[in-house]
């Protein structure tokens, strides 16, 4: 029995490290070197934020919720869409990284499809501006 317990400890430690890594990744979906270099070409303005909110309500609310808190009624079973109003979720994510996640999706683990075929680049940048406007300060 002592051997099993001794062999179990490294496996448990490895599992813990994997869990911490996955959790850290979930808190920062970006991490794209390309995204870190991108600059938002759309100035944040009341017009951009309003357009971004409209695009968000049309495309994103079903999973992320009308209030962007991750409580949408149509999220795939077993998934937990991000609370996009939580500044902790956004920590470390640049506008470019958020843009790329919206454009290309986050998956397969996070099960978010990309919207490049449904939204123009300008619409996506407006959504980024909207999300910045609703994040906790």
Residue map of PLM features:
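Bacterial N-terminal signal peptides
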Residues: 10-19
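Axial heme c-ligation environment in periplasmic c-type cytochrome domains
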Residues: 26, 76-83, 103-134
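Sequence/structural segment immediately N-terminal to covalent heme-attachment motifs in c-type
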Residues: 45-69, 98-100, 104
């Amino acid at each position: 029995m002592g051997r099993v317990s001794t062999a179990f400890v490294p496996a448990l430690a490895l599992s813990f490290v994997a869990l911490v890594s996955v959790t850290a990744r979930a808190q920062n979906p970006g991490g794209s070197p390309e995204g870190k270099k991108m600059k938002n070409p759309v100035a944040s303005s009341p017009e951009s934020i309003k357009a971004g909110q409209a695009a968000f309500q049309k495309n994103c609310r079903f999973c992320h919720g009308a209030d962007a808190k991750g409580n949408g009624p149509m999220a795939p079973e077993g998934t937990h869409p991000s609370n996009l109003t939580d500044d902790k979720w956004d920590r470390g994510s640049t506008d470019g990284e958020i843009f790329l996640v919206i454009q290309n999706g986050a998956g397969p683990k996070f099960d978010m499809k990309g919207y490049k075929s449904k939204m123009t680049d300008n619409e996506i940048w407006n959504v980024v501006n909207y999300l910045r406007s609703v994040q906790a300060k």
